[in-house]
Amino acid sequence: MTLPTTRWDGTLTAMSSISHASDTRGTITLLRRELIVQPGGQLVHVPIVSGNTLRGRLRRVGEELVRGALGYEGRLQPAAAHALRGGGSLAKTSHEPLSGSRLALLRELVPQIGVFGAAGGGTIIDGALAVGKVVPHVVETNHITGAGATVSAFSATQIEAYTRQDDAGSHDFTAVAPTADLLFGADGDPQPAPKPEASQQMRFNVETFPVGTVFSTWLRLHRPSPLELAFFLDVLDTFTRDARLGGRIAIGHGQVRVNLSPDPAPPAVGLPDWRATTAARANEALDALAGLT
């Protein structure tokens, strides 16, 4: 049995600055950028967070929930553990690739696989979940988001400076002055401009989205089973309560407030208790996960 496809649309709002590293130029680690065609036809570089970043965060939340239900801590082969938490990798196997009834059983027993997919067991497993890119509300994306932003992508980011010392002492990292600025070309491509008076030793700079930046994004769960929908609703609820996005999470970056609306609304009753259902067949699930090695 499958349920209708559900799509969530809405916004993420930065409650702490967002880091999403791309390349490093000089002492500045830049945000990831894409070319966006403007209404007038010109191409402009705009910082955008990849959908893979958001999907990876949701996947890790899901893995933690499934681990709690199945109790597989320390009982999985590395390839299976990597497939559940990181998506796995496609490699040659000495046995028959995972397919047919064995693959169907794995998806049935482990909703993490059904929702997020994985690579393992000599095959790529498609997941039901698709995740959109996380697009900032800036002038250059108004025709995409419909947000009516007034801030340009050229001024929508900031440079945060840090020292390369460890965090064992009481260093005042946030008081460190940036050693470079960003200068933007006509197409929005950033170039670092070192400050000649600033000492470069033991310092580096990170370009971030500032607190308060609003982003548009979407999620789509394609024809899930009732168990997969129940599981993903739990994943989304857990993520929403303590949402993080991007890198440098351990030092305070990446906290976001989530505001996503589903269409159609998931059923209020009738969904299975995915934890109890999954835990009841834990031994079968662990056997099935062995097929990912």
Predicted stretch roles:
Residues M1-T293:
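RNA-binding basic/glycine-rich loop and surface signature characteristic of RAMP-family CRISPR effectors
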